[in-house]
Structures are given as C-alpha cells and as structure tokens.
Amino acid sequence: MLAAAALQSAFTSCPGRIGRGSVYWPSSVTLVLQDSSDYLLTLAPYLLGRVRRGVVGSSRYAKRLREQIRLAAADSAGRAVLISGEPGLEKDNLAALIHFGSAARRQWLVRLDGATLRADGANLFGQSGSDGDWSLLECLGDGALLIDKLDQVQPSLQLSLLELARTGHWSCPGEGSRPRHFGGRVFFTAEAALPAFDQVCDLIRVPPLRVRR
C-alpha cells in the first residue's frame, strides 16, 4: 500500500510525464518495469512536478530575471545554475521554471533541502559500502538535481557538490568506491555568497520582490 501511494503521489505531481497509458521514464533508465518502479519510489519524496508560478512584474528587474531564466533554459550545455537571493523569493520555483522550460523537461526534477543533508552525502550518494547502488543520484539518471539552501550544506559536502557541478563526477562515501558520472543538470539555491561555486555555475541573482513590480 505504501509503495502504491508513493507511486500515485509521484504520478499526480508529474502530470507531464504520463501519456495515454504510458509513462515517460527517464531515457537513462533501461530496466524492467519493477526496477523502474523501485527507482521512482526512491525519487518520489523529492520530486518537483510543476512550476508554481512565473515571474511577475513589468520593471526592468523582472524583465531581466525572465531573460536570465530563458537563457538558462536554452543552454544546450546544461551548465550548473546557482540562484541566489534573500529569503522568501521562491528560488526553487525559478529552478523549476528553468528545468521545465528546457529541452530536458521530460526528465525528473528532484529537490533536496541542503540543511538536512548528511555531511558524508549519504542522502545523495548512498550509504558507505553500497558503491552508490540505488542511491538517489543513480536513480535520478539524466534527471535534474536541485540542492536548496546550498549555504546550509556542511562544508565537506559542499566540496563534493562543487565537484559534481564542475565535472559531474561523484562517488559513494567510503574507501574503494568507484567514481561515477551524473548526466543530469544541477541547480543550487542560496542566500549567502558562495564564491567557489561562482566559478563553475551560471549565476542568477534574484532581486527582491519590492523592486520587481
């Protein structure tokens, strides 16, 4: 029952992925249906299925923000994106606008709260000794990863995320874990400055709502 409920929740939150009698599984997942369901169960608690709203306002700040989102969505290289700004600006929604406006819109988008991530990255990369099998990143395949509140991530994990954004490489915690490659796009949001990430990400600085009208 729990599995069925999780699958139903994921389907209803991602209506664009479900056609008439068919589910648009990520292209990198070439498993049988049961394994595909297991992948989805891993992702279901984190899926973002739709955009809540667009960017409103007629000011030059709002127009510039819309243009930045358009350019990021059109980026064929799929560079990592860092969206920064003060609290309450729905920066995660802007990441969703970019993803669902891009050519990769049929891929999954998952969101993780940086404040809740373990320092060793097990939430993302899998438990020590698992070699990354059935980790969230493996299940995500070529989907998009959003780390919300990157500035609240533990410094040791920030280094791993920096490498993920720069090269796409990641590995499971623990010795002897083989390196893997993430084929999807990475989004970050933050309230504080993160100079190291400025070097490897496209930057979108979100103006306050009070100047965007």
Predicted feature locations:
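Conserved post-Walker A coupling segment in P-loop NTPases
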Residues: G54, Q68-Q127, E138-A144, K149-Q152, ...
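Conserved catalytic/switch belt of AAA+ P-loop NTPases
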Residues: S156-H181, E191, L209
